[in-house]
């Protein structure tokens, strides 16, 4: 039993736009508040981490890639305003996206790229684009704007990675940590 022809094209276009990270009319505006949605991206990130853990001494990058620190000081996080949390999440997503694009370039320039690594890098890029779109629909601002009641936002802590294993571990930890904490709080505040 298939999808009627009159619905097939709109569904296909919707899935295409979502995979590109573009907003889709008719998409539930708070889809990220459904825990199953975020868990799907976390699961994909964890799979990529698990695949690359077996090759800890696998391909190294020619240069180190900058990624966000994923450690969370829960006391400091709880005292931050949701706007400050949003800034930290956007900065982290931006660093991750840039690092994963650099990893994609490493694979593209490799003489024998691993199809499995390429698949997980492509999924990570698609996932980050979709998460960006879902966060915009939640009302999170992409621009790292300092909240009006603070004079300055503490810059996001960063460090560097030199392997796919470390990159995917950071990606997985960031989604399970800061992103999940932020969306949980933003969704709760939006329900009030």
UniProtKB/Swiss-Prot annotation:
Signal sequence region: 1-26
Database matches in Pfam families: EPO_TPO
Family per similarity comment: Belongs to the EPO/TPO family.
Residue positions the entry lists as glycosylated: 50, 64, 109
Official protein name in the record: Erythropoietin
Keyword list, A-Z: Disulfide bond, Erythrocyte maturation, Glycoprotein, Hormone, Secreted, Signal
SUPFAM superfamilies to which the protein is assigned, alphabetical: 4-helical cytokines (SSF47266)
Physiological role: Hormone involved in the regulation of erythrocyte proliferation and differentiation and the maintenance of a physiological level of circulating erythrocyte mass. Binds to EPOR leading to EPOR dimerization and JAK2 activation thereby activating specific downstream effectors, including STAT1 and STAT3.
Gene Ontology annotations of biological process type: erythrocyte maturation; erythropoietin-mediated signaling pathway; positive regulation of cell population proliferation; positive regulation of Ras protein signal transduction
Keyword Glycoprotein: yes
Subcellular location: Secreted
Primary subcellular site in the record, as a coarse category: secreted
Cystine pairs: 33-187
A Gene Ontology term for the protein's cellular component: extracellular space
Organism superkingdom: Eukaryota
A GO term, aspect molecular function: erythropoietin receptor binding
